[in-house]
Amino acid sequence: MSETNTTDAKTVPAEAEKKKEQSLPFFKLFSFADKFDYLLMFVGSLGAIVHGSSMPVFFLLFGQMVNGFGKNQMDLHQMVHEVSRYSLYFVYLGLVVCFSSYAEIACWMYSGERQVAALRKKYLEAVLKQDVGFFDTDARTGDIVFSVSTDTLLVQDAISEKVGNFIHYLSTFLAGLVVGFVSAWKLALLSVAVIPGIAFAGGLYAYTLTGITSKSRESYANAGVIAEQAIAQVRTVYSYVGESKALNAYSDAIQYTLKLGYKAGMAKGLGLGCTYGIACMSWALVFWYAGVFIRNGQTDGGKAFTAIFSAIVGGMSLGQSFSNLGAFSKGKAAGYKLMEIINQRPTIIQDPLDGKCLDQVHGNIEFKDVTFSYPSRPDVMIFRNFNIFFPSGKTVAVVGGSGSGKSTVVSLIERFYDPNSGQILLDGVEIKTLQLKFLREQIGLVNQEPALFATTILENILYGKPDATMVEVEAAASAANAHSFITLLPKGYDTQVGERGVQLSGGQKQRIAIARAMLKDPKILLLDEATSALDASSESIVQEALDRVMVGRTTVVVAHRLCTIRNVDSIAVIQQGQVVETGTHEELIAKSGAYASLIRFQEMVGTRDFSNPSTRRTRSTRLSHSLSTKSLSLRSGSLRNLSYSYSTGADGRIEMISNAETDRKTRAPENYFYRLLKLNSPEWPYSIMGAVGSILSGFIGPTFAIVMSNMIEVFYYTDYDSMERKTKEYVFIYIGAGLYAVGAYLIQHYFFSIMGENLTTRVRRMMLSAILRNEVGWFDEDEHNSSLIAARLATDAADVKSAIAERISVILQNMTSLLTSFIVAFIVEWRVSLLILGTFPLLVLANFAQQLSLKGFAGDTAKAHAKTSMIAGEGVSNIRTVAAFNAQSKILSLFCHELRVPQKRSLYRSQTSGFLFGLSQLALYGSEALILWYGAHLVSKGVSTFSKVIKVFVVLVITANSVAETVSLAPEIIRGGEAVGSVFSVLDRQTRIDPDDADADPVETIRGDIEFRHVDFAYPSRPDVMVFRDFNLRIRAGHSQALVGASGSGKSSVIAMIERFYDPLAGKVMIDGKDIRRLNLKSLRLKIGLVQQEPALFAATIFDNIAYGKDGATESEVIDAARAANAHGFISGLPEGYKTPVGERGVQLSGGQKQRIAIARAVLKNPTVLLLDEATSALDAESECVLQEALERLMRGRTTVVVAHRLSTIRGVDCIGVIQDGRIVEQGSHSELVSRPEGAYSRLLQLQTHRI
């Protein structure tokens, strides 16, 4: 995995460079708005226009008031009257702004939430409508989860309040022009002339950022897939000590994202710097001509002030509107990916109106001259002129070598794929012409690897028939021999099964899958190795149940184990893409052809006892009751108690608390900011440089304010020579400030981007490292679903960067501006400054109330969206099951249900936020009115001057904007605080099984002597269900030990405990006489090889999957391991050989091929201890025969633990242990145990023998 993923990560830049910039037209982001949304957007836009226009109107009034100040300095009574009148106008204006800003914020926020909820629904609906081939080639689970969790949030950011914000600033710009033209049209015209330069700088910045954003998203999506794979297959990663491989691959993948972040920082610094620089120089030009016009008598100081200030604020607003372009660019790039899927028309249409329904289905299926290759490997032909007929009501078995195309027959009948040529007919009608939903309603499917969803047992069975009654569900479960073990669970049918059914044994999962298919009561039954995971007792009863349910139905049985199909109506043998033999068992045996050869191969591995089938039912029924029912009930601590609650911590974080493990409760650490700074210590030089840049940027605002206030005073000079001299002086200051702004903004944003990107990368690496340090039991919990964790990994680190790195930059800048402004104000006029200081708490309180209104919703929204990511991830990863059971609408319904919480809360949130924002605006205008009135009062008393009051007032306006901007960052800072808490809850968790324990003894070599001594064990997720009680087992070094017993008896638990996935509650698990808890876990696992029942492969090449077994494996070593596992032959036959990608979770390979690669991986590891959990269950007879010999060679001289349902595969082991009721009830060699006819092993053997 590591090599391929590393290579992929390195090729990302080249691919990204070649890719054309992909972005959606902005208006198309609103494609999912309904009439109410349009009304909300209209009202919100109207509010934004009024709100935006208020500032130029304020300056119009202010300019007239300045004239009242300047022209009435000799008539103090008239001056106070004029100022008081305009102060009242400011209060009225504040009320208008209060209501308009409320409408702007409330309507746009709520509309954005509504539209994105519709987008999420439409996106998942479109994903689920795609044909299965799409998921083989174009979509990975990690990509879908990333889109649902991250891309939709980017779109929401782009179409919510930021649109209102953009309209608001654009209105300020346009209204500024209007007011400017009314006041002094020549100055306004001059202002218009310089705007294109400002717009060009901003547009170039936005264009550059769009390209970088698109590439960055693609790059991180690749990294997210690597993380999701590692977490989803954590048992394989742990077993092969692959944590560092996963981390290295992930690190390599995000390295390119890091470099793109640096570029984005430079682009932002240069973009904003140039925008403000050009704006400053433009203001200098306007100021110069304003002085000329005043001296020529073409205007006065008040009108010039109004025109200039309107132009300046208009220009600044244009620049501020550009700050939203970054969010729009990200939204467009994310929207493109979403809309690409939404608009993609699947090859196989699911539309109910597309196709016809048959009045009656008999079930005759015919393949006529079918040629087929998988879309992912079009050059590898599976079928050539393939012909086969499945008669109505008959059972036909399809057999052949692993990879011969048996399961492909099932996929084509289900219409997961369409043939390249030829026809597939149902009752003489080509299935392409039938409605897809109708077709699949007639078919019941049980796969080789059962796919369950992370919900209750009841809900999983109900996928077969959503409207089924409880009686029907229990009948289906009883028929599948599942009812007995389900009813013994504390919560029965309401028990949660965990992600992919991880809380159940393989047999239990398969029985639930069979119950699901039986509930459907289909006309056609497709059984793809449906009983392969069952123990002898369960298989016997389930096989009888299947025999009953098969009566009267067209049944297609795909089988490796030929003993299960001897009584079918017909058997078809597939070789090299064609049917080479058909007939009954007896007919084919008599031919001594391909089928007879397969039988001989299977007999070589020990299945020789073909008793009279007529005795099967009576004997199995009698014998099934002799086994303890309890032993069938629970695997591994099977199912967890799903009970959990939500609570709000003291710091406002929403927490999910498992009742089974309350000690896991986490809160955002109180000192998280200090810890985050410490975590960021390697970037201190960059942080300091960024801080210096922020401080330098912070001086720009006060400098502008001071020069501006001085210019107002200059406009009332009666000495025109002094006016000209001073104007020239201030113009040069503005030009210098423009050049200064470019450097200051570049230093600020570039260095803070380096700090932020490095912090994000480090946090992501540390989080994944911490996640992969947790014990396996942690991953068994619902809240640690792989899709949820992958989404958390993607968003939390980005939120930390946004809230901390990026926002520290703005806060430092604004705080510098605030401090500088107040120092200047107190020096100029301390009385007015004191009043300003007195009004600030009112302004801050209003904004703080807004912050509090937002704080309570972050947790709810994040939690609900995380759950939607989990549902989407499950739906995609189990897409074949979803498609086969027409469960798209059910998945979509669950998805929409989880979206209701944020939708309901968003209404209240938007209203509250809008109201409090409006209140803060009213406080601002009220404060300004009070200050101006008080200033006029001081002037009238002779204790201050017109110049001082205006200077302090202008400083107030600039400072208030800085405070407002700082406080407006509250939502992002709150979200970042939540994310920091989430990050540290992951980093701080103390794993219960530390793989890197410094005090543990390193393991250089082991003999392989294993002992379980008085072990009590229950799974952490279900501590009340004991798997082992006083369990004792000794396995001598170099010997082979088989473990048998009923499904759920705890066989796989032995292997899990040897791997130390879990620790015992009491007693010891010892290797070479040492408690394994005292041994270094990673060095111990290097000595152990594991092959699981369901092989876990990574989305890499075949070569990399095998090489995963040994660091630095050579090509010859990989090929030798593949030969030993009987995999070299089929691998060599592929066009790309060992470089063939296996697809996500090995989807491009058959079950047998996947298992052989997994075995080759274990062979390459060359372990001292070998753990085989049904290692050959997925193989056909020929492959199993060769592979069994390879395994026997591999087992020589090694301690081997074999978990087996098929007793024929373990007759040659040194010792066999029978597990029942949490203990070893019988132990000995095959011959010794067979000599005890009433023993547990003999009963199991009789069951298995007589089912044949």
Swiss-Prot record:
Pfam families: ABC_membrane (PF00664), ABC_tran (PF00005). ATP 2 binds at residues 780, 1019, 1021-1022, 1051-1053. Induction: By auxin (IAA). Induced by red light, but repressed by far-red light. Induced by brassinosteroids (at protein level). It is found in: Cell membrane. InterPro entries: AAA+_ATPase, ABC1_TM_dom, ABC1_TM_sf, ABC_transporter-like_ATP-bd, ABC_transporter-like_CS, P-loop_NTPase, Type_1_exporter. Disruption phenotype: Reduced rosette size associated with decreased brassinosteroid signaling. Reduced sensitivity to red and blue light-mediated leaf positioning and morphology associated with reduced auxin efflux, thus leading to constitutive upright petiole angles, and irregularly wavy and small rosette leaves. Aberrantly enhanced organ bending, including increased gravitropic root bending. Reduction in bulk stem auxin transport and lower levels of shoot branching as well as small increase in branch angle when combined with the disruption of MAX2 and MAX4, genes involved in strigolactone-mediated signaling. Changing residue 529 to Q: Lost ATPase activity and reduced brassinosteroid export. The chain crosses the membrane at residues 42-62, 88-108, 163-183, 187-207, 274-294, 308-328, 688-708, 732-752, 822-842, 914-934, 949-969. Belongs to the ABC transporter superfamily. ABCB family. Multidrug resistance exporter (TC 3.A.1.201) subfamily. This is ABC transporter B family member 19. It comes from Arabidopsis thaliana. The lineage of its organism: Eukaryota, Viridiplantae, Streptophyta, Embryophyta, Tracheophyta.
